Amino acid sequence: MSLMTKLGFRALVASCLITAGSAANAQVNVLITGVGSTQFPIATANFANEANLPQQVTSIVRADLARSGKFTNIDAGSTPVPESASVDLGAWKAKGANAFVAGSVNREANGQYKVNFILYDTVKQQSLGGLSLTATDTTLRTAGHKIADYIYQKLLGVRGVFATRLSYVIKTGNRYQLQISDSDGQNARIALSSTEPIISPSWSPSGTKVAYVSFERKKPIVYIHDLPTGRRYIVSDQKGNNSAPAWSPDSNTLAVALSLTGNTQIYTVNSTGGGLRRLTQSSSIDTEPFYSPDGHWIYFTSDRGGAPQIYRMPAQGESAGAAQRVTFTGSYNTSPRISPDGKLLAYISRTGGGFKLYVQDLQSGAANAITNTNRDESPSFAANGQYLLYATQSGGRNVLAAVPSDGSAPPQILSVQGGSVREPSWGPFMQ
């Protein structure tokens, strides 16, 4: 490795430790549109009895379906249609809708809401079932996301991710905020606020905890944050840098990158703290670990071959088997992320002076760039594997973008008015 290349990789490792731009706090709006030319036409009638509610379930469902890029919303008019109504499916088919949704929101004596709906196939002239959900003023949005998930799965055969959550870091003035939001960027909550950088959020498989790196003690330390209770605790505070936490599929272990002995190497720690174990034994820089979904492998970035590339090793470490190089397209590849089905590898490749998001088929080895942006970083798969969230630059600002994982459409920038946002992580399916 040339001195310039080695310095470049060391700069990358350093940038993984301090990466947050100035920003004004704002709502993230997630949009994924323009996916191919086979969008499914669907009409969602206004749900009965929701006109005066704090959240309009119908609007949430329509917005979810539209931003997925997989559906076209057919105008359903303004007349509410409850799930109990007799529906002329032929008439809706004639209007261009291949599916129709009817529903209602009813307030119960205890102050909660009962949200009911039915999904119809207008082509086959039959019901595709529905759900009856209980919600409160604060969970009506979640009910809407769950309805959209049901529709997505019934019509496309793939589980929807509308009811999942995102995490990301926003900086306001001299304050950093780790925020948790719905998958559409709405309903954002501040999990942690600090005057020191917060980086590398990583969701637990259950979706109830987030591991991250905080500099609040003037050095990078790995914390775990329990979202329901707000409790947080340190899991790695070793000598030097503690970075890049990644959960094992069983939630019992975190892989981390530590500079405990000089060069950054990969270790594991118990998710409750303690149990430190070294996995790599190289004189190079080994960093950015990520578990395969079956828990058998850890993918990571290393410059052991002369330049940064993606490798994988047994989850027990190199003592159980030599690390194998995985990426061969391009001379500088970092930030491995494996799709939930274990078939795809997303990573960042230095290309033509920029950095692009690539996706590689792990069976064939074929790899392709799937973005038209040039400062990509921090990829994160959606729980169904159909989309990737990542950080990039647009108009001189740090932004988030989303793109179909098959590259079938250009990436869409996620709108954050007046500010910058970094460090995205897409949460798992909620239990």
UniProtKB/Swiss-Prot annotation:
Primary residence: periplasm
| InterPro entries, A to Z | 6-blade_b-propeller_TolB-like, PD40, Tol-Pal_TolB, TolB_N
Q: Does the keyword Cell cycle apply?
A: yes
Which of UniProt's keywords are assigned here?
Cell cycle, Cell division, Periplasm, Signal
Where in the cell? Periplasm
Q: Which positions make up the signal peptide?
A: 1-26
Q: Does the keyword Metal-binding apply?
A: no
Give the top-rank taxon of the lineage listed in the UniProt record for this protein.
Bacteria
Q: Which Gene3D superfamilies match?
A: TolB, C-terminal domain, TolB, N-terminal domain
**GO BP, one annotated term:** protein import
Task: Extract the ranges annotated as region (Disordered).
Answer: 411-431
Which GO CC terms are listed, alphabetically?
periplasmic space
Q: Which HAMAP family does UniProt cross-reference here?
A: TolB (MF_00671)
Q: How does it assemble?
A: The Tol-Pal system is composed of five core proteins: the inner membrane proteins TolA, TolQ and TolR, the periplasmic protein TolB and the outer membrane protein Pal. They form a network linking the inner and outer membranes and the peptidoglycan layer.
The record's comment on protein family reads: Belongs to the TolB family.
Q: What does the function comment of this entry state?
A: Part of the Tol-Pal system, which plays a role in outer membrane invagination during cell division and is important for maintaining outer membrane integrity.
Protein name (record): Tol-Pal system protein TolB
Annotated organism of origin: Burkholderia lata (strain ATCC 17760 / DSM 23089 / LMG 22485 / NCIMB 9086 / R18194 / 383)
